[in-house]
């Protein structure tokens, strides 16, 4: 698994902890890395994502709301909601990362940590977010 992949997995765990525990993102990040080893590149990416999502939470959640018209954000499973936040933030802030990579990685995290339906749900919502943002893969 590459550094960004491991970073995304760590970021998901931290985003989940931020929401579940009510602690600030910087506090969760500091605690997480005291208890969990990680390579420097993966750690840096995870930290950037977690802090970025926390700082841009209103915009990230609004992008998710617009793309998931049949699901209220508050009613989504916590894992799905945080995978969507991670993927939406990347789509909004990391234009150098291909759309397909962001979606594939998010779907894999959703399948690993979510329910049986999580992968398809996350794929559909993130695909709509990408379209709303005008993110198109060049090789499509």
From Swiss-Prot:
Keywords: RNA-binding, Transcription, Transcription antitermination, Transcription regulation
Family matches, as InterPro entries: NusB-like_sf (IPR035926), NusB_fam (IPR011605), NusB_RsmB_TIM44 (IPR006027)
UniProt entry tagged with the keyword RNA-binding: yes
One GO cellular component term noted in the UniProt record for this chain: cytosol
A GO BP annotation: transcription antitermination
Top-rank taxon, per record: Bacteria
Keyword Nucleus included in the entry's annotation: no
Molecular functions per Gene Ontology: RNA binding
NCBIfam families: nusB
Function noted in UniProt: Involved in transcription antitermination. Required for transcription of ribosomal RNA (rRNA) genes. Binds specifically to the boxA antiterminator sequence of the ribosomal RNA (rrn) operons.
Record family assignment: Belongs to the NusB family.
HAMAP family: NusB
Protein name, as recorded: Transcription antitermination protein NusB
């Amino acid at each position: 698994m590459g550094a960004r992949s491991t970073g995304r997995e760590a970021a998901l765990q931290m985003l989940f902890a931020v929401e579940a525990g009510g602690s600030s993102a910087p506090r969760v990040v500091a605690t997480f890395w005291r208890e969990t080893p990680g390579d420097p590149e993966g750690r840096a990416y995870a930290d950037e994502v977690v802090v970025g999502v926390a700082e841009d939470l209103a915009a990230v959640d609004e992008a998710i709301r617009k793309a998931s018209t049949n699901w209220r954000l508050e009613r989504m499973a916590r894992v799905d909601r945080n995978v969507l936040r991670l993927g939406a933030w990347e789509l909004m802030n990391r234009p150098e990362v291909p759309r397909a990579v962001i979606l594939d990685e998010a779907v894999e995290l959703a399948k690993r940590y979510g329910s049986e339906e999580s992968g398809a749900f996350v794929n559909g919502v993130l695909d709509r977010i990408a379209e709303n943002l005008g993110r198109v893969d060049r090789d499509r």
